[in-house]
Amino acid sequence: MPDQPHTASRPPLATRGADLEHLTRETWDVLIVGGGIVGCGALLDAASRGLRAALIEQDDIAVGTSSRSSRLVHGGLRYLEQFHVGLVREALHERARLLELAPHLVRLEKFLFPLYGRPAVTRSFYESGMVLYDLLGSAKRGGRHHHLSVDAALELAPDLRREGLQGAMLYSDGMEDDARYTLAVLRTAIREGGLAVTRVTAVKAIRDGGRVAGATVRDELTGVELDVRAAAVLDATGVWGARPDRPFGSEKATFNVLPSRGSHILVPRERIEVRTGVTIRVPGKVAFMVPWPRHWVIGTTDDPFTGPVDRPSASGPEVERILAAVNSAFDVGLSREDIVGTYAGLRPLIAPSGASSTVKVSREHKVAVEDRGLVRISGGKYTTYRLMASDAIDAVLGADAKDRPSGTADLPIIGAAPRPELDALIARLSREPGMDVESARSLVDRHGTEAETVVELGRRRDLIRPLVAGQPMIEAEVAWAAEHELALSLDDVLARRMRLAMTLRDRGESIASRVAAIAGDVLGWDAPRQAIEAARYLEGAHREFDVPA
């Protein structure tokens, strides 16, 4: 099917109203609760099998864990130390698949792993790990790792701490924009026939004759409660499954969810001179410096979390630990003043009995049929979402799964095209009035083949200009987000569609009114409503993404 937005020319809120009516009129084969990467992947998986499938999300798509990762598509080097070989192999195979299915959103990046300590012991220990990583699948698309001398390592990373440096390993791993990838999976599912409605909360299960037969839901924009009927419900709520008041709680629950907080900082790229990504060994784990267009995304922590799961933020001690990790490997004296933003996500780990630390808790996932008509999934890694989704829909179908297999292994994500075609599109768009190579590349890296349609929208509405002076994103992307990407607030646009909430030191105060005006033109906001929306966004953005005290 062609890569066309599902909303056509209808106003987004009118379309949402029609979708809500459809949601309550139909009896679905499966109702998916949760709009993270697993829920969106499950909607696509179900649609690929020809099922009548719907998804509800209480807030925005990818508002939780799926927009707050380290932005890596990887096997997980550190899991080899814990002997989770099967998990690493599975993740590396999926990394190769995602590079094929979404080359505009997933790419390979070189990572430098500096080696410190006794030369023979250090090199042999990490060399064996890298060889195993290659054998398990990393070499399939990324090539084999290389050992670098001290001089070669310093050529790539002049700011490396020289004392005790024994050289480095150079290997490849994948990276992506997690929020935009999740959104693209959802929009692909809609293209394939799935239905998704945001700002709809599951209140309680509907039970019929001892089985779960749907859910009573609440439209968060109106407060109205509605009944949605389904042959099966899939609970893909992630860390929200740790709440004792979850709507699909069951006496037959086979596992508990243990939230683990992973925090990150963002630092200007020019602050640390390195030509690759970096993997830093710290006691008990590794930290990553992931190259973003103008920033380093640095993290992560791994601590049990017992606070509210909505909108977590980094803590002061976590930020200090991340700074210490960077300064242990680089002679840069990185400090809090260098940080432009922070963020935190919660991993929905499967809790082993008596666990006091999350560092060594398995990242494998579990699927359970907890009641007739109720399937629950949690755990896992972002990289393996497609397999998780397939397992979940297999459980929904039960014995019928073998006759209706998943079709996502070869289903390109919306906006995908071979890399040469994407490069040609960048060259073509860079010649458009008001565009240059950086803005064209920025558009294609986030929208793929749809970048051309975004530019056409911008031409029609006079929105081909930078949203932020000196940065590549254009105003047309705000209108596109509101019209075609299910964005209903400034937070949706700036935190997840454009990722500016965490990369601008002012959290977007200088552009909030302009963004509200552009989005408001699509969403029907008058001037007072625009001011309210801008103020609401800024209050939340400062709370979530500012450097903590």
Model-identified regions with their sequence ranges:
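C-terminal accessory subdomains/tails of enzymes that are appended
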Residues: D59, L105, Y116-G129, L148-E163, ...
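Glycine-rich Rossmann-fold phosphate-binding loop(s) that bind the pyrophosphate
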Residues: G34-G36, Q58
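Extreme N-terminal leader/targeting segments of oxidoreductases
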Residues: M1-V30, D45-R49
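Glycine-rich FAD pyrophosphate-binding loop
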Residues: A47-S67
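A conserved short coil-to-beta-strand element within the FAD-binding core of flavoproteins
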Residues: T198-A213
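Core beta-strand elements of the Rossmann-like FAD/NAD(P) dinucleotide-binding domain
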Residues: E26-W28, T222-A232
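Dinucleotide-binding Rossmann-like beta1-alpha1 core, especially the glycine-rich loop
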Residues: R71-L156
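Short hydrophobic core segments
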Residues: V33, V228-G238
